[in-house]
Swiss-Prot record:
It is found in: Cytoplasm; Nucleus. It comes from the Eukaryota. Pfam families: Abhydrolase_2 (PF02230). Hydrolyzes fatty acids from S-acylated cysteine residues in proteins with a strong preference for palmitoylated G-alpha proteins over other acyl substrates. Mediates the deacylation of G-alpha proteins such as GPA1 in vivo, but has weak or no activity toward palmitoylated Ras proteins. Has weak lysophospholipase activity in vitro; however such activity may not exist in vivo. The keyword Cytoplasm applies. GO terms for cellular component: cytoplasm; nucleus. GO terms for molecular function: carboxylic ester hydrolase activity; palmitoyl-(protein) hydrolase activity. Keywords: Cytoplasm, Fatty acid metabolism, Hydrolase, Lipid metabolism, Nucleus, Serine esterase. GO terms for biological process: fatty acid metabolic process. This is Acyl-protein thioesterase 1. Belongs to the AB hydrolase superfamily. AB hydrolase 2 family. It catalyses: S-hexadecanoyl-L-cysteinyl-[protein] + H2O = L-cysteinyl-[protein] + hexadecanoate + H(+).
Length: 238
């Protein structure tokens, strides 16, 4: 099926048996995460990487100026007070992301061989997809992000959402999406949504959230996070 989201694609070097779809953050594009995808590509010879580009829309946080964004953001200091979230924009983006997933399914890749992930705003969309989708994905990657629509998300959850494995990474010096929002989000998933938090040192479990903190890391990624993500992906796509 055709997809409405423009995207970059890195084809696997061997037979295609799995797909990773990764959503960038506010103001970025798929090109921003291309170096990371290329870094991981050689370790996953059967994986296709898809890096979508967000549409350009007016963003309240940017004084109404248009920029690449998955949904409108009004503030960054109240991310866990979700009643002002752009629910309509989020749900529209979910449909577009699901088109990408469906295209992979139509090409012969099972849902349980597809990982969806994202950074910051893209991570929030990935988490929202995980909680509401009827698809049983191989896993979800949430980097430097938060749980959106937390005032109503429990009522929106699919019955198998908590069975999807999660890798969650966040830097302790994040000046954009404060580290405490990441901590609170993981606590929310455990306490309100029934997720299982993995013990420190556990690489992967199905189901389970692997939560990794990176001391001193700002709103970005780091080599250790990429290594941790690689070890998690190895298990998720085994």
């Amino acid at each position: 099926m055709p997809t409405s989201l423009k995207h970059l694609k890195i084809s696997p070097k061997e037979a295609h048996t799995a797909t990773v779809i990764f959503l960038h953050g506010l103001g970025d594009s798929g090109h921003g995460w291309l170096p990371v995808a290329k870094m991981l590509w050689s370790s996953f010879p059967n994986v296709k990487w898809i890096l979508p580009h967000a549409p350009t829309i007016p963003v309240s946080l940017n004084h109404g100026m248009a920029m690449p964004s998955w949904f409108d953001i009004r503030h960054l200091d109240k991310l866990d007070n979700s009643e002002n979230d752009d629910e309509q924009g989020m749900l529209e983006t979910l449909k577009s992301v699901d088109e990408l997933i469906q295209a992979e399914v139509d090409s012969g890749i099972p849902e349980n061989r597809i990982v969806l992930g994202g950074f910051s705003q893209g991570g929030a969309i990935s988490v929202l997809n995980m909680l509401t989708t009827k698809r049983k994905l191989a896993g979800v990657v949430a980097l430097s992000t938060w749980v959106p629509l937390n005032h109503k998300i429990v009522q929106m959850m699919s019955e198998h959402a908590k069975d999807i494995p999660v890798f969650w990474g966040h830097g302790t010096n994040d000046p954009v999406v404060d580290y405490r929002f990441g901590q609170r989000s993981v606590d929310f998933l455990v306490q309100k949504c029934g997720y299982k938090l993995l013990s420190q040192g556990t690489t992967f479990a199905r189901p389970g959230i692997r939560f990794e903190s990176y001391p001193g890391m700002p709103h970005s990624s780091c080599p250790q996070e990429i290594e941790d993500l690689k070890s998690w992906l190895m298990e998720a796509l085994k």
